[in-house]
C-alpha cells in the first residue's frame, strides 16, 4: 500500500487522536500535542460523517474542558485549524478557543 504524504499525516493524526482519547477515557489529563490531536481527529471524523463546516466548528468547541487538559494547556491553544474532507470537497476548518 502506498500512501501520499497527506494520507500519512491524516493517519498519524488519527493514531495520535486515538491515543489521546484512550488517555482521556482513563482520566489522564491531556498535554498540548494530545489536546491538538484529540480535537483535530474528532473534527476530521465529524466532517467525514457529513457534518457541515459550521457544525464541525461548533462541535470542536465542545470536545474538551479545562478539566480535561494539563494546567496551562487551555491558555496555549487559541485555535485548532485543519483541512477536513467533506462530501463536497476539502475545506479549512478553524475552531477558536476550543477548550472551554
From Swiss-Prot:
UniProt-listed CDD domains: Urease_gamma
Record protein name field: Urease subunit gamma
Record-listed E.C. numbers: 3.5.1.5
Classification via InterPro entries: Urease_gamma, Urease_gamma/gamma-beta_su, Urease_gamma_sf, Urease_subunit
NCBIfam families associated with the record: PRK13241.1, urease_gam
Localization per Swiss-Prot or TrEMBL: Cytoplasm
Domain of life: Bacteria
Pathway(s) of this molecule: Nitrogen metabolism; urea degradation; CO(2) and NH(3) from urea (urease route): step 1/1
Top EC category: hydrolase
Keyword Transferase found: no
A cellular component annotation (GO) from this entry: cytoplasm
Entry's family note: Belongs to the urease gamma subunit family.
Record key words, sorted: Cytoplasm, Hydrolase
HAMAP family according to UniProt: Urease_gamma (MF_00739)
Source organism of the structure: Haemophilus influenzae (strain ATCC 51907 / DSM 11121 / KW20 / Rd)
GO molecular function: nickel cation binding; urease activity
Main location per the UniProt record: cytoplasm
Primary gene name: ureA
GO biological process: urea catabolic process
Assembly and interaction partners: Heterotrimer of UreA (gamma), UreB (beta) and UreC (alpha) subunits. Three heterotrimers associate to form the active enzyme.
One Pfam assignment: Urease_gamma
Catalytic activity: urea + 2 H2O + H(+) = hydrogencarbonate + 2 NH4(+)
Amino acid at each position: 500500500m502506498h500512501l501520499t504524504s497527506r494520507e500519512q499525516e491524516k493517519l498519524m493524526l488519527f493514531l495520535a487522536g486515538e491515543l489521546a482519547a484512550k488517555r482521556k477515557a482513563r482520566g489522564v489529563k491531556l498535554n498540548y500535542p494530545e489536546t491538538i490531536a484529540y480535537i483535530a481527529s474528532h473534527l476530521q471524523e465529524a466532517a467525514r460523517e457529513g457534518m457541515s463546516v459550521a457544525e464541525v466548528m461548533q462541535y470542536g468547541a465542545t470536545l474538551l474542558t479545562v478539566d480535561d487538559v494539563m494546567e496551562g494547556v487551555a491558555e496555549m491553544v487559541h485555535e485548532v485549524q485543519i483541512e477536513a474532507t467533506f462530501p463536497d470537497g476539502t475545506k479549512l476548518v478553524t475552531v477558536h478557543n476550543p477548550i472551554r
